Regions:
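Bacterial Sec-dependent signal peptides at the C-terminal "C-region" and cleavage site
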Residues: 19-32
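Active-site mouth of glycoside hydrolases
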Residues: 30-254, 258-268, 275-278, 289-290
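Single conserved hydrophobic/aromatic residue that forms the stacking wall/gate
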Residues: 291-299
Length: 299
């Protein structure tokens, strides 16, 4: 199993080079990818990055976090003070196209307020746009109550699954959303980086997420942000993720990844991702149902 996993990672590296060579054109999202030297210089100028995936305790999902009625700056301030005391200097935070669609101006004001709270505690977040995980549908307004004992009971995919078939309608809206947010904060030093898509292909989307993944990289590149961009690989064993992973590995400025494996296999992951000669950031790890008894999961 270990050898098979290693082969898959190596394959992604070389397969990705071939994919990029075959798919690039004059409008390629790879045209303005940061060079290895530029991203290494950027990374060398950062502190040792330590943080967590963050949503306030009073919000069940991204919509509730950013909606005007439920945005809880007092709670956020309290929790970020705790994060600062723990030594955290970054957070991974999910945005919401649903809130932006219904209240773009208000949402950006709340994002600005959130960034000011972050700066107060010397925290620079990375923002996530899209997500293929958990509940397939979402709606603006009051969100469901949490289900006791159910992990992520109210978390929602973004965009909703029901919207994805009509790309002629969906993509222009999402492009406007992405470009509005990125252009607003493209040179804002309160933001560490942009994480464009959480676990593309999850929830049985598989390679159907490639189109949106490709487009979001292009839309963000069009805005020429001063911050690096990434999307993290997360499934190393499924052949149906090879094209997605290859694209992310060959278009991200900085390589990010998720790993819920044991310590030895995580070390193997790092070893092979270093072949890409770019800095690495692990944006999800820790608790695993497979290795729940291992003390290293809480390091």
């Amino acid at each position: 199993m270990k050898n098979k996993w290693c082969v898959n990672v190596v394959f992604l590296f070389f397969f990705g080079i071939c994919v990029c060579a075959c798919t690039q054109d004059s409008n390629s999202s790879n045209n303005s990818r940061w060079s290895e030297e530029k991203i290494q210089e950027w990374y060398d100028n950062q502190p040792w990055l330590v943080g967590c995936n963050y949503i306030p305790a009073t919000a069940i999902n991204q919509i509730e976090m950013w909606s005007a009625v439920t945005f809880d700056s007092e709670q956020i301030d309290k929790e970020l003070s705790w994060a600062h005391e723990l030594g955290f200097n970054t957070l991974r935070v999910f945005l919401s196209s649903v809130v932006w669609q219904n209240d773009a101006t208000g949402m950006k004001k709340r994002v600005d307020e959130f960034l000011n709270i972050c700066r107060k505690y010397s925290i620079r977040p990375m923002f996530v746009f899209f997500d293929d995980c958990w509940n397939p549908e979402s709606a603006y307004g009051k969100q469901p109550e949490p289900k006791p004992g159910v992990h992520n009971s109210g978390w929602v995919q973004d965009p909703s699954c029901s919207l994805r078939k009509d790309t002629l309608t969906l993509y222009p809206f999402l492009q406007e959303y992405i470009k509005d947010i990125v252009r607003t904060y493209a040179h804002d030093d309160r933001i560490l980086m942009w994480d464009l898509y959480n676990e593309p292909g999850n929830s049985k989307h598989e390679e159907t997420s490639l189109s949106l993944l490709t487009n979001v990289f292009r839309w963000v590149r069009d805005c020429k942000p001063s911050q690096p961009i990434t999307a993290g690989i997360w499934d190393y064993n499924s052949s149906r993720k090879n094209v997605l992973n290859a694209f992310m590995l060959n278009h991200s400025d900085i390589i990010s990844y998720h790993n819920y494996d044991n310590e030895a296999r995580h070390a193997e992951c790092i070893k092979f991702l270093k072949m890409l000669n770019r800095p690495l950031i692990c944006t999800e790890y820790m608790l695993s149902l497979i290795h729940i008894s291992e003390p290293t999961r809480l390091r």
